[in-house]
Amino acid sequence: MNSSCLGLRRTCFLLSVTAAAVLLLLLPRGQPPAAPRRRPPPAGPSRPSPKREARPAGSDVPGDRGGGSGAAGGGRGVAGSPWPSRRVRMGPPGGSAKESLELKDIFIAVKTTRKYHKTRLELLFQTWISRARGQTFIFTDWEDRELRLKAGDHMINTNCSAVHTRQALCCKMSVEYDKFLESGQKWFCHVDDDNYVNPRTLLRLLSAFSPSQDVYVGRPSLDHPIEAADHVQSDGSKTSVKFWFATGGAGFCISRGLALKMSPWASLGNFISTAERVRLPDDCTIGYIIEGLLEVKLLHSPLFHSHLENLQRLQGESVLQQVTLSYGDPENKHNVVSVGGVFGLQQDPTRFKSVHCLLYPDTIWCPNKKMS
């Protein structure tokens, strides 16, 4: 009895082991193999976003190809085009496109002196200032009641000397710069009281840039950069710096972004001390700060004009495409633009009235017919 039970147990044990072995052999064949776990691909090296260069196409402002007072060989623009070859509208990275520029965004500073209030300034108020009164500020050296009534708070008495010296010129430029920063406007443009400003072409030119860019545009009066002593070394020797500058007699413009960077050398009277250190007049000191210290290049433009150049070569319709014009001094009174005007030379010796009537024929004092 015991032996038969023992044999039965052994048989059951062997059958159990055999069944388990069979199940183990059959189980892998009955199921598909598990899919291997996929790993995410390794991240490649991060690529920086492209740098947004604050640079208009081809330096954007046409190079000066003219003679005489132009920056021969120094122009950085596109030959044969009176305007930038493409309009760059750059905003901050990831931001919206740059807003369109309006005339109200431009701060136009006119530098003058007491003796020209009745002559030069009167002509400007009669012509182009009448089309940009809200944007134009008169910087003078004397409290003129009549001018105050005409210009209101847009007449700024700088309390600078009326003498035509380096110190007096830099004093006025210092006040111009500070007033521009206070204004909050996007562009600073300086002109003299013998300049005609075409607001339309000025707006068109500056619209090619963003005011947050570093932009310094104007016309040199020399065909080469100038050199100024920069620092005095411990051994008494001086280091010098070469730079271009835009002549104030033709006018120039500076973006707000660049003007803010000039602040350590230009704001709150620092402009005067900077000018004294390098012993340069106002427009040269502007160029020294921008090109010499901040290393921002002047954009040479042939659209700005001073009395130092041969203005008679500007003729016909091309006169109306310029940003600024000027006229010769009394010793060179025939140095004026050649425009088929509505006034004769005796009535309009500067040609500003004729230019203005061609641009704005609806002006009330413009005659209906051109003079032959």
From Swiss-Prot:
Reactions accelerated catalytically: 3-O-(alpha-L-fucosyl)-L-threonyl-[EGF-like domain protein] + UDP-N-acetyl-alpha-D-glucosamine = 3-O-(N-acetyl-beta-D-glucosaminyl-(1->3)-alpha-L-fucosyl)-L-threonyl-[EGF-like domain protein] + UDP + H(+); 3-O-(alpha-L-fucosyl)-L-seryl-[EGF-like domain protein] + UDP-N-acetyl-alpha-D-glucosamine = 3-O-(N-acetyl-beta-D-glucosaminyl-(1->3)-alpha-L-fucosyl)-L-seryl-[EGF-like domain protein] + UDP + H(+)
Keyword Hydrolase belongs to the record: no
EC identifiers of the protein: 2.4.1.222
Membrane topology, record value: Single-pass type II membrane protein
Cytoplasmic topological segments: 1-10
Biological role: Glycosyltransferase that initiates the elongation of O-linked fucose residues attached to EGF-like repeats in the extracellular domain of Notch molecules. Plays an important role in limb outgrowth, it directs the formation and positioning of the apical ectodermal ridge (AER), one of the key organizer centers of vertebrate limb development.
Protein name as annotated: Beta-1,3-N-acetylglucosaminyltransferase radical fringe
UniProt source species: Gallus gallus
The encoding gene: RFNG
